[in-house]
A protein has these predicted regions:
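General secondary-structure propensity
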Residues: 7-12, 282, 643-649
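Small/polar loops that bind or transfer phosphate-bearing groups
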Residues: 37, 268, 666
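Noncatalytic linker/hinge segments flanking ATPase motor cores
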Residues: 49, 56-59, 112-121, 192-200, ...
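Short alpha-helical hairpin
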Residues: 93, 178-182, 243-244, 330-332, ...
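Non-catalytic accessory/interaction domains
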Residues: 126-129, 134, 145, 151, ...
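Hydrophobic alpha-helical and helix-loop surface patches within well-folded domains
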Residues: 155, 187-444, 558, 569-578, ...
Length: 779
């Protein structure tokens, strides 16, 4: 079967949130045609104006066409949804917009279609709305036809693309366009938000230019809209030519924190990378989702690092992508990067740290092994060969192998099709180095898996590269080994354990990050003692590189959350030592590091929080990077007396960046009933559905109120579950929430979920419980 085009007319009733549609589909088919249609009433199917029979099935219709080439017409009607997928309503203030979210399999909730990424087609969309409404789609407006107090907006035809990339937005918008070159780049917001659009507009222009140059393929559409949606389940979505974002992932200005501006840059870069990897070339089926997400993640860091070198974005990469992926992939509940997807309901479960962070980290490892030029040459060849069509992982390996002459296919087979990653133990005997690999498991177990590992090793100052394809390998350098280090620049996706830390050579920031990250998770796996771990930490009490400092601070803060009596002393000692170093530094990464240390201290030290809370009276003049910490401190030290003040400030903020600041503070109170009151704001709509994703993990990380939060979750778990139904996100929320929330009550949590199973979140619950049991060993 092949589909040539969908010609879609939508008559939209914005007031009553419903619509009717007439759709003409040109295709050729050899047998029965099945159109996916969920929550849509199909009223007729016609050929040449004549009604033909069709059968309604659950979430689809079947049309007995036999061998057919031509055009069919489908008439249908449907209501706008409220569950953040398909075509849905996104409220803001006293108004709303209508937006769409079709990835992975939700286009069927808007129009009858073959909702499968392999069946690409051109789309021609026309929408009839009231005169005062604006409409956005993937392409520019071709013409507008007035009809009394209504109008029909006809959009230009799209290139061939998958159904999940179609977009429709309806409402009242403000726009900020850059017409300086092709394509036109615009930021679109709901009324009153456009003042924070200049920075994202500039990023959009810069990243499109970067990708056109890197990929050697011009951006193929006339325009690129970056659309801020006030209620959005995910971070962003790469609809071709009409990218949607939650407001905190798109909007920023000079008053924004560096963390906010960096996030905006990264998310824009990620979604724009998809315009080539995902939109121009699309995976054949969701098994290869990682082809889209891993590449967009990897390329976004490369793009940001090029545009903003002062942000050291490869450092951010190991902090934000590699570290999280290595944790999740060391659990028993994980999956290969190339995950088998047989049912559409399984698709949402693989939008996770493996498909994004691990896949991107493997690409970084492969680029380091091939060299940047050969890697880029292979990518360009792949895009040229498969543009406007679909591809599989092996197609990419072949392109990279042909460009480099290296066995990329063999290496990727090892890393993509099996889960997990290795621990490499390094020992020295005279002139010999012994490398031993075994799969690293966070609970201390292992199995017989081996990996084909591109190893970088420096011995006595001399760099060596090799492929380790066996369990044990011995290297004789012919002279006594005085110093060495393995995994240069933390480019490899593996952990390293040294038999003798005293002979480890001098390390850069990335390598120090790798060392402290590896030793923390070796501690959790009971493969090093706390004394060995503490020795590594104490060697860095006066460390001046932000990467190991940020990592150690996060580790010690985590240990504080697990057991403040046991680990609080070391955590406070490290933070106080580091605060002195970073307090007066003014470069961007130093301010970010200092802010991270200060936020941790607010939750660890009541006196510190009380002192910092005094800054709240002059919040407008506080460093934007410290505002989160100041508001948290005001809440944490003020207690019940200031709760209503913080809540009112949360409710009255215009921009989501500030709303998130106050929401975080509302979950930082030391009093359990106040935090629970905040969680219950989600019942009234005070907290958006999209933010349920955030509030439960945040509440679980408040060590003073966990008992109250657990009681609330047991009582009201059906509310967040129903709010996020269909998005596939609730499992991830529980995976992130249970490890800390369940501390001290492992059996109770286990019993609760055995009595109240949540099938769509089963994997996330199992991951969370596995991590909870590992953490409990630290108590």
């Amino acid at each position: 079967m092949q589909i040539e085009y969908y010609n879609i007319f939508i008559d939209f009733d914005f007031k009553n949130l419903k619509y009717s549609g007439i759709e003409k589909i040109k295709l050729n088919v050899d047998d029965e045609l099945v159109l996916d249609a969920e929550g849509i009433e199909v009223t007729s199917v016609k050929i040449n104006g004549n009604n033909i029979n069709f059968a309604k099935r659950e979430n689809s219709i079947s049309i007995p066409l036999g061998k057919f080439t031509g055009e069919i017409e489908v008439d249908f009607q449907a209501k706008v949804r409220d569950d953040l997928v398909g075509i849905y309503v996104a409220p803001y203030g006293d108004s709303y917009m209508v937006s769409t979210q079709f990835e992975s399999s939700h286009a069927r909730k808007f129009i009858p279609c073959v909702d499968n990424p392999a069946y690409k087609a051109e789309f021609k969309l026309s929408v009839k709305v009231d005169e005062d409404l604006d409409v956005i789609s993937n392409t520019p407006v071709e013409r507008i036809v007035r009809d009394g107090n209504r109008k029909i907006i006809e959009f230009m035809k799209t290139p061939r693309m998958s159904t999940y990339l179609l977009y429709l937005g309806i409402g009242k918008f403000e726009v900020n366009y850059d017409f300086s070159s092709s394509p036109i780049v615009g930021v679109i917001t709901t009324p009153g938000k456009i003042s924070r659009s200049d920075i994202p507009k500039q990023f959009g222009r810069q990243f499109i230019s970067f990708y056109e140059n890197y990929f050697g393929v011009k951006y193929p559409l006339p325009k690129e809209d970056l659309i801020a949606v006030p209620e959005f389940a995910f971070g962003a979505m790469e609809n071709w030519g009409a990218i949607t974002f939650r407001e905190t992932a798109l909007l920023a200005d000079k008053t924004s924190s560096l963390r906010q501006t960096m996030r905006v840059a990264e998310v824009i870069a990620h979604e724009l990378a998809h315009q080539w990897f995902g939109d121009l070339v699309t995976m054949k089926w969701w098994d290869d989702l990682w082809l889209n997400e891993s590449f967009a993640t990897f390329m976004s860091y490369k793009a940001v690092n090029t545009i903003k070198p002062e942000w050291d974005y490869w450092g951010q990469f190991v902090l934000d992508e590699t570290a999280g992926a290595m944790l999740k992939d060391s659990l028993h509940i994980t999956h290969p990067i190339e995950a088998k997807v047989e049912k559409i309901e399984d698709i949402e479960q693989i939008f996770d740290d493996i498909s994004y962070g691990k896949g991107a980290s493997i690409l970084r490892m492969i680029e380091a092994y091939l060299g940047e030029e050969d890697f880029r040459k292979g990518i360009r060849s792949y895009l040229e060969q498969y543009k406007y069509s679909n591809a599989k992982g092996e197609n990419l390996w072949k392109s990279l192998k042909d460009a480099s002459g290296k066995p990329v296919d063999r290496i990727m087979e090892s890393w993509i099709k099996q889960e997990g990653y290795p621990l490499i133990t390094v020992s020295i005997n005279g002139s010999k180095v012994k490398l031993e690999q075994k799969r690293f498991m966070q609970d201390g177990s292992t199995d017989e898996k081996t990996y084909l590992i591109p190893i970088t090793i420096e011995i006595n100052g001399k760099r060596t590269e090799m492929l380790l394809d066996e369990k044990n390998k011995e290297i004789d350098v012919g002279t006594d080994i005085k110093s060495l280090k393995v995994n240069l620049n933390k480019a490899g996706f593996y952990r390293v354990k040294y038999a003798d830390l005293n002979r480890v050579s001098e390390m850069n920031g990335l390598e120090k990050f790798g060392l402290v990250n590896d030793y923390f998770y070796l501690l959790l796996a009971k493969q090093v003692t706390f004394q060995e771990y503490e020795k590594v930490i104490r060697s860095m009490l006066k460390e001046y590189n932000y990467l190991p400092v940020r990592e150690i601070a996060d580790q010690l803060y985590f240990l504080f959350l697990v057991n403040k009596e046991k680990y609080g002393g070391l955590a406070l000692e490290f933070h106080k030592s580091q605060l002195e170093i970073w307090a007066t530094k003014t470069d961007p990464l130093s301010r970010l590091t200092y802010a991270s240390l200060v936020e941790n201290m607010v939750m660890m030290d009541n006196d510190f929080a009380k002192d910092l809370s005094k800054e709240y009276t002059r919040l407008d003049s506080v460093d934007p990077n410290l505002k989160d910490a100041v508001v948290m401190a005001y809440a944490a030290s003020g207690g019940e007396r200031v709760y209503d003040e913080i809540l009112n400030a949360y409710r009255t903020q215009k921009f989501d960046e500030e709303k998130q600041r106050y929401l975080k503070a509302l979950l930082s109170f030391r009093e359990g009933h106040l935090v629970v009151n905040t969680l219950s704001l989600s019942f009234t709509g005070d907290i958006k559905k999209q933010d349920i994703v955030r509030i439960l993990p945040l509440a679980s990380s408040n060590p003073y109120t966990r008992g109250a939060v657990w009681t609330w979750l047991k009582t009201y778990i059906d509310f967040p579950r129903k709010s996020l139904a269909g998005t596939g996100i609730f499992g991830r929320v529980l995976s992130d929430t249970l490890p800390l929330l369940g501390i001290g009550r492992v059996e109770e949590v286990k019993k609760f979920f055995s009595l109240h199973p949540i099938p769509e979140a089963e994997k996330g619950i199992e991951q969370g419980m596995e991590m909870l049991e590992i953490i409990s060993n630290l108590i």
